[in-house]
Amino acid sequence: MHQQDIIEIHKGLQKAYIDNAVNSNLAYSPQFITNDYKRGVKILTHIENQLMHCDEFSISVAFINRSGFVELAETLKELERRGIRGRILTTDYLCFSEPYALDKLASLTNIQLKIYHVKDKNNGFHTKGYLFRENGIYRIIIGSANMTQTALSTNMEWNTQLVSTEQGEMAKSIVQEFERLWKDELSKSYDEFIEDYRKIYNRKKQIERLIREQHKIALQNDIVD
């Protein structure tokens, strides 16, 4: 990080929060990030851009599914080739994350994957944060977007991108919270959790299919009656 970076961050803060007429470098400016198909804007594009420029990354999201992995697969594979290391923390909350996606993420040699075990359904895990570090500067996207195709590309999602030095209070607070969750005893490594989680996930899907079938039969009986 150089003094010029500090100057650019100051300009970015002025433009974002004081006067939008200030001339600043967009790479150093806080931004509102959403999906807008009319303008061809996607949250995915912002995340891919930060991934391709960062020295390391950390992600904490409640839900990861197959489509979300597919959206980011080529970018993540490129980072694997370049040796850019990352950490991804998700959860078994509501048993939503798909084992397929978790298997694929864990197969990437540059990524550490953990899952936070929610003991109490009334104390959920619903984070959505993407942290990118480059030359002593953090760019952090926080908001409503999980790692799913709809969240990253089509849903109405609201997110903000923060820009901060490592010494900035905002970056420090967010990084410390990620580290706290990452090191929590309830955060289990992929190898520790995946087989148990797979069984629970498959059982849930079987129950959901049974409920749908029973509902379909009930509707047919109502029509006959």
List the model feature ranges, each with a label.
Residues 1-225:
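PLD/PLD-like phosphodiesterase catalytic module centered on the HKD motif
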